[in-house]
Amino acid sequence: MGRSLKKGPFVADSLLRKVEKQNATEDKSVIKTWSRSSTILPMMIGHTIAVHNGKVHIPVFLTEQMVGHKLGEFAPTRTFRGHIKDKKGTR
């Protein structure tokens, strides 16, 4: 179930302030954030936001196709190392 339309999308206040400040000054430096649950808005297109994955910040360049998605979708938290090999012939 999605979020109610009357509430609007969730974006962390600190992240929104930083994006608005960069839009006003035409600055395109990387913005660090820990807010993986923030929704990507059209005003964020063209910015690079470093999203924390629990260990490091992963830079994500925001494009038009990402609008409406969450920042955390683009910074994976787990590393898949592959399935274990069959141990039948190892004896």
Curated annotation (Swiss-Prot):
SUPFAM superfamilies given in the database record: Ribosomal protein S19 (SSF54570)
GO annotation, biological process: ribosomal small subunit assembly; translation
GO MF terms, alphabetically ordered: rRNA binding; structural constituent of ribosome
Top-level taxonomic group: Eukaryota
Keyword list, A-Z: Organellar chromatophore, Plastid, Ribonucleoprotein, Ribosomal protein, RNA-binding, rRNA-binding
Localization (cell): Plastid, Organellar chromatophore
Classification via InterPro entries: Ribosomal_uS19 (IPR002222), Ribosomal_uS19_bac-type (IPR005732), Ribosomal_uS19_CS (IPR020934), Ribosomal_uS19_SF (IPR023575)
Gene3D superfamilies noted in UniProt: 30s Ribosomal Protein S19, Chain A (3.30.860.10)
Pfam families: Ribosomal_S19
GO cellular component, one term: mitochondrial small ribosomal subunit
NCBIfam families: rpsS_bact
Family statement drawn from the similarity comment of this UniProt entry: Belongs to the universal ribosomal protein uS19 family.
Role description: Protein S19 forms a complex with S13 that binds strongly to the 16S ribosomal RNA.
Name used for this protein in its record: Small ribosomal subunit protein uS19c
Native source organism of the sequence: Paulinella chromatophora
The organism's taxonomic lineage, starting at the top: Eukaryota, Sar, Rhizaria, Cercozoa, Imbricatea
